[in-house]
Amino acid sequence: MTKCTGCKTCVVACKDAHNLEVGRNFRKVIEMQTGGWRQDRATGAWHQDVEAYYVPISCNHCADPACVKVCPTKAHHKRDTDGLFVIDTKKCVGSGLCAKACLYGVPVLNPATRKMSKCDACADRLDHGLQPICVESCPQRAIEFGPIDELRKKYGDRATIAPLPDADLTKPSLVIRPPKGLEA
């Protein structure tokens, strides 16, 4: 996050790699603004504490995923090989319960198949020793992917920042480096 400029190259690369139609995205970049302007009553001068930052987000492959708990057919499941959460489209009935349960708004309906779909961290690329397309495409190198223990050792364990929900709710496999001034 300290590096993300909001260019959305990761979003476009993901859409292209997964051949997603208009309106369906597996990634998003949320723009956040905080602070405001205030007038000094004594001098009339205006002062600001405005800050803006971008939050690139997709499926966080949570340790306690709400989407998996509500899936009526168990189509949402964890891969044994690497712990990624994926959707088995043969089992999915497109109920949309996973989308309603996900605090990050990740699962989306594929209108052509009437099945749910979401970021799978480019599992096919990972299986061939490659990084997810969002990681490779980011011109600022703001996105990293790897074993969560290694990322936490490198960057710390913070996983909550506005506008994201409290990390204690689903325990996302996510590490956030907040912009200066928002570290606390």
Residue ranges and their predicted role:
Residues 1-184:
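Non-ligating segments of multi-cofactor redox enzymes
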